[in-house]
Structures are given as C-alpha cells and as structure tokens.
Amino acid sequence: MLVAILPVWGCTWAGCGRGTEERIIPARVWATGPSYRVNSLELARAETSIFARGDGTIRLTSAVNEKIGFNLVISAVDSAVSGVELRADDLAGTEGKISASAIRAYRPYPITVERYPNWFLRTQGLREPRAYPDALVPIPVNGVGASPGSIAAQPLVVLAGQSLALYVEIVIPPEARPGRYKTAISLVGPNCTPLRTPIEVLVRDVYLDSKVSIPVVAGVQLGPVIASFTDIDPQNKSVAISKPECRKAIEKTFALLSEHGLSPYCDEIYPRFSQDVDGNTVLDWSEYDAFCGPFIEGGGNAEGRGAFAWPLPVGMSQPHPSQFDGMDSAAYMLVLQDYLSKARAHFEEKGWLERAVVYFDYPSVIDPNESELQRVRRLIEWVHDAGIELPYMSKLIPQPMTPFGWTAYHYVDLTRVVDIWATPARYQDAATLAELQRLGKRTWLLPDRPPYCGSLAVEAPPTHARSIAWQAYLQGHEAIWLPRATDWPGKVLDEAISQDDQASDAWLVYPGKLFGCDGPVPSARLKLLQAGIQDYQCLRLLSEHGHAATAGLLARSLIKACGTGAYGDNFQDAHWDRRIDDPDVWDLAAAILREEAELAVSEHPAEPISLEKNRADWLRFLAATRSLEVWVGSARLRKDPRPGQTGYLATIDAEVRSELRTSVEGRLKFGPLAEGASAIDDDKQIGPLEEMSVASRSLTARFPEAPLCDLDGHYIQSIVFDAGRSGLVEAQATFSISRVSEVSKPPRIDGSLDDWPPGTQNVMGDFRLIAFTHGSARRRAESQTIGYCCTDGSKLYLGIQALSPAGPTVSNVESNIVTYEDLRPVGSDLVEIMIDPTGVATQSDDIYHVVVKSTGNPIFERGVSVSPPIGSVAPWPGPRPEYSVTRGADGWTAEIAMSLECFGPRESRNLVWGFNLARLEPVRGEYSDWARAQRYCYDPASFGNLIWPDGGVGE
C-alpha cells in the first residue's frame, strides 16, 4: 500500500512553477468539521458547518483549555498542486494573543478495510475495499512539528481533480482569555503567492477542567509497540522493558494516550512469583515497580496525572490455576489469597491502593454456563475473604436476559459481590444501571458495536468515536473502559484488514516509525474520542449548574437509544436508526453545547449572545434529530371470513413513533385504495403520543380479488398519519403476493428450471436489501433472486434462480451448518425459505425453515437454529423434501419439492400462507428478501402472502 501512495506523499515535482515569476497556487482551500470524512475525489463544497466560500473564512467555537480540530481541505481543481507547505499566523484577539505554535497539522495515511461486520453491511454499505484516512502523521506548520528528513516533513502534493484533507488542531491554552481570535493558515511554495485562508475562533468563557472529565481507562498492549520500534522479541517482555529504546517507545505511547485525555494502564507485567519451602508466596517487585510505578504515579504524561485505575497484578496468568490443581482446588484458593494479600500490601506501601482494581478475565465468553458462573462467585468470595477490600470488576451481564428473548442465558445474581460492572454496551440495561448506581456500585462503559454503542472500528462513521463519551454521560457511568488501545496488527500500515475475525477497534494509535517518527502517531478516532471527552466536560458543567435538562436534550437527540434500549423484538434484533451519524449535526450540537455552557456558568460571555440565533440553532438541531415516523411491520392477506362475503381482507400493522418534544395526536388511515377496494377498519385515533413513544395500530381493507401485483409479486398501498400542526407522514406498505399455480405434470427435481411453466402470478422477485430504511425505499440487491411456486395437489414445488454478478467469488464449503450473526446468516451463498402454513404464527418456533446453499447441503427444520437461540428448534416433520442444485456461470438454480403432509392436517392449513424468500450473497454481503421484512426474516408477521387455489391446499 505504501508504494501506491508514496507519489502523493513525496515532493517529486518542481513546485508551483518554474522560473522567477510568482504563480498562483492552483487550488481551492475549504474546511469541514472534524467528523466529516472527505473523499479524495470530492471537490470544494460551497458551504459546510464551519466554512462559507462567500468570505472564505473558517469559523470555530471553543472553550478555554480545549483542543479543537477540523479538516483543512486542499482541492486541486485544474492542475496538480505540489511543493507546498503550511504557514500559520499567531491567533490575535482583543484580550491577548495565542502563539501560532498552538496550531498543529496532520496528514492522514489510509488504512484499507476489506471485511465488514454485519452492523456495517446493514447501515453503511456493502463489502468492497475502502481506504479510511485514519493514521494521522504530524506535518510541519511554520517549519516545525515533524522530524527533519522524515516522509511527514516533505512538501504536500495533490493530484489534479483530487482533494487532500489535512487534520488541523488548535490548542487553546488554559491561560487564554475568552474572546474572538483571528489567524490564518496559508499554503506557501517556491515562486508562489501564498494562498491564505482566514480563521476565526470564538473562545467562550467556559473552562474545561479535567476534574469534571470522564476517565477513559485504556489498556496498552506491549507486544505491538516492542515489535514496531525495536528488534527485541516481543514475547520476552521482561527483557524488552529493560532496554532503553523499548522503554522510550512505551513511554511515548503512554504519553500520547494521556495527551488525548485517556488514562492508560498495562496488565501484562507481573512481579516475579515464587514460593518458599513452606509454600508461602514470595513476590519480587523490583522489575514491576521500575516499569509500572512511573505510569501509575503519573510520570507517563506531561500533567503528572496519575492513573485513574490500575489492575492489581493478579489474574488467570499469575498465579496460574493449572499449577495448583485447577480453579476449584483448595490449594489454588490458599495460594491466591496469600498472593492477593501480599499484592495489596505492596500497593498500599507504594501509595497506589486507591487506584487498584481486581479483575480476572474469566469467563472469557459472554454466555457462561452454570458451573463457570458458580466458579466466578467462588472466586469473588475468595478475593473478599482475603480481606484485601479492593473493588472487583466483572464484564458479566448483571440482569436476567429472559425478558429480552435470551431464554437460554444462565443468570446468577452477583450484584452484591461485584463492585465494578463493565458489561459490554450491548447488554447494558438502563433500569439495571440505575439500580446498580443506586446501590453504590460503579459502572463503566465498555464499548462494543452499533447500534447499542458507538464503534471505535476504523470503518465506523467518524461520529461514533465522539459519541462514546456522550453515551457514558447519558448512562451515568463513572468511566469508559477500552481494554485494547494499542493492539494493532503486525502489518497494519501495509496490508488490508481482510479477515472476518480481524478486529479493527483494538488500537487508537499507529506505529510512527514508517513515517520517520520515533513514537506512535494518533488515529483520527483518537482525536474524535478526545473531542467527545471535551463535550462530556461541557455536559457535566451544564448539569452541575442546574441545566441537566438542556444537557439531556442534546444527548438524547443524538443518541435516542443505547444498550438494551436499542433492542427490537429481542436481544438479537436491533433498531438501527436510533443514532445520529450526520457530522454536520454533531458540529451544530457541539456549538450549541458550548454556548449553553457559557450561558450557564459565565456572568461575562466572550461576546453578547444572540438569543434569536440561539433559538434558530436549536430549531435547526431539533429538526435534524427529531422526527415523526410511520413504520410498516406487516402487510398480510386473508380470505374474508364474514358470512356471505368473498374476496380478501388486507391488514396493515403499523407503528407511529414520535420523537417530537410536544405531545402528538392524529389519525392513521389508508391512502387512496384501488378501485373496488373499501376500508372496513380504518381511521384510527392515535395519541396523545409523548416524546420518544410508539403506538401500534392495524388498518384493514376489503379487496374483491387479491390485489393486482407487479410482475415481481408486489402491491404498494399507502397509509397516512395526519397529526395536524405536527405534520402529515405517509408510508408505503408492500403486500408481497404470489399465487401457487396448479400443474398437472410436476417439474423434475434436477436443479434445472427448463421444464417449469411460464411464470405468471407465481413469481417472487425484486429482492431488496434488508436494512433500516423503509420498505419501498430500500435498495435493490445487485445479485437478484427469483422464486417460482406450483403444486400438483400433493406437493409444494419451489424453483429458485439465484443470480450472481461477474467478479470475485467466495469459497463455499460443502456443509449444512449455517452461522448466524444479528439474525442473518453469514459466509455462504444461500437462499432461505420461511413458511407459515397457518397464516397466524407469531414466533420463530412456529415456522418451517429451509436453507439451500449454492453447494447443495440444505437444512430443513422447524424453527430457526440461530445461536444464541431466539426460540425452540425441532426436526422437519414428515418426509424429507427432495432437492437439487445446479451451478452455472451467472449464478445457480435450485428446485425443492415438499410434501404437503409435512405442514399439518389439511384443515389447519390456511388458503393464504405466510411466506418469504431471503438471499445471502457473500461476495458483497448482500442480504435481501422478497417480502420486504423490516429488520430480520424470522418474524412471521413480516412474511409475504402465498395464495393457494380456491379449492384448498392439497386438493
């Protein structure tokens, strides 16, 4: 990768021009907020949240003692820009001056990602190589800020038609006076007129104090640091940390993390452990104290701030249970308690006791069995019985998961014995957290993944890193815990992140040696995490000065649900639209937050605050974050059961969700109905609906015949929620309808569709991606799938044509095992078939589930065997269906024949079955379906409609 991008890093051209005549630098300079990810092919925008081309000025808002960042973008419009450097003026204000040395700049280095988790595929885009500008390499401003002779110190190059975004940071010192400061940053080059961009910084009368900050406890992994900066074996840490060059690299790593507001720690170094002849524990602390002591006491950062928390050097590695007959043995208990007592005594002697926590990485899974949970309880009791009186930390789930659909979860109540709960964000429940905090327990936020928490993954939207501290504020956490902050892959700067099991959220810094730096360099995510920490300080200031409601309104508008609050039907189903990712909205929120903080804490604002502008900003913010929505959950048909009636009843189940601050009332009704159709259960009253609440209603209309569908089996019916002054919202309900055609001669089950009769109303096509967008607005799958159905009176025949785009393929292992993640399959090219012959099923247990892979190897089951389970699973009843699969150049086809006797007694079968087809195409990660399921395919309410001949099923 480095070879590919070096030409735009090095100064290989002659500069702005030859000769002595001054030239104009052929570039446009503009700016965006720090959370905006600039595409290299993106040309200059006329306006952003901090920049307007009209006067060409960058306008920023800051507090005192804050670091503010933005993207300075250089767009080479007509010709290449080369040989330019940055110059900056002092920041001059009416109340004083801030030196130009407060302005720093970084050149992003791209990190390539080729594999993506399901949350990304659902919400951000499909699988393809993407380069993310994440490693930030310091570059000179006014000739200082990078090592001379390094790649980073070379002049900048921007190719014609491209843009280069530099990350620029302005450090507002603690002694700065509030007020408006002006400066400029210029592009300069040989024989060129400097290209000057004015900057205005409004420093508000708000002081950011670390005393109201949120501690971010960050684990430092030594191996990657040692391997990147020295030739020492990273496995031999004892030798490595004794070497000056290694120590220097580690110190710089600690210092960089501390500089960005984190509290780093290391749990990989232990005292030397032995036993005397009587079996007593002997600990040699000399090496441990020499290495860890300065970091615990604050020697690893410029402010001399000691570590917020430091794990007592005890755990599953030392003393190792296997050396003392295992975790359940009395011998291990005695050694462990003796070890703990001596470790505590040493920490007390050194003055480190108030920072110490006890943590065992056991069990290592989030779903432990009963014996593992009892072992944890016993372990905690041993710790407490040792009399060390130190907080015990656990990552376990502190509440039963049965209410959330995880009926198989083994829960043991450890509330009374665990002191610090650091449960992964996905399982943090608001009511449980509140109760733990009421009991005096400490809770830490352990980020994992969206939508339950912002993600620190390289590929995550940039706002996610910033949102983590906001979530900690909302949930009342004492700290944020990042167990891995430096665990970068060995060739992270050279090779793509491509393996499915390869993390991309385990490091916040990068090895800087490649760029000529003698220590690590920050990531863009670290900068945004720091921005969120500074936001947290403003939120705390608002709360402590009687404006908690204002702080809460801002935070709850950006993060509307987190933890279990983001669950849908169960713990594996998620509401993906409960977070705001728009970077401009986050920039607006940050500006409002600092203005509100100044109004709350200052008697002398930096300059008069316009209440009219403040109100306009609030209205703009709330309009961007709060909405009134209508979601369609089900669109089903059934034969009209009323005496003397024929035709079909069409029922739409819909949810109205109000995020508006004012109470909402209105009526939900059908839009225009097709000719001949009539509403029979319509015009439903909803409300008063309070802020962030949901109301569910059903609308029913009668159709004399089944609705006339398009060629792919879809009929669109609009519904409308009229809330008067609050607005009118329209939604599209998609009735997915296919008729089972009758055939006298059934098709051969040979994997070929050649002998199928021409498709008419028995076609199922136009598969759409299962994402969080509304039904008809969902994107068409590039790899389309078409289904056909027919019957000969004894069997249901299904034909499937699964198309694949030209390009790379994945290796499909011939196996009838399917892996699921977030209620969708992963890894294989396959089609799922979901059937509800009763038409009234309510849960996954009730459905018939078939999985056909492109390799064959089908699965036939009753229920869906996802893990962890969301319901019961049973073998397929009755005869095993016949099947055949054929692969070709443009995809694959499959045929399946299922005996109707498998689907229960004839009298229990409905004339309209619930039915859906779903397709996973693994090359791009497309997961699509026919029936337009809202979030996942295993809820029978989301199925489409399979209509049998009027004579009945199996006639």
Pin down the residues of each PLM region.
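Short, hydrophobic beta-strand segments
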Residues: V73-I74, L166-P174, R697-C709, M898-C902
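Catalytic-core region of carbohydrate-active enzymes that cleave or remodel glycosidic bonds
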Residues: T415, I420-Q502
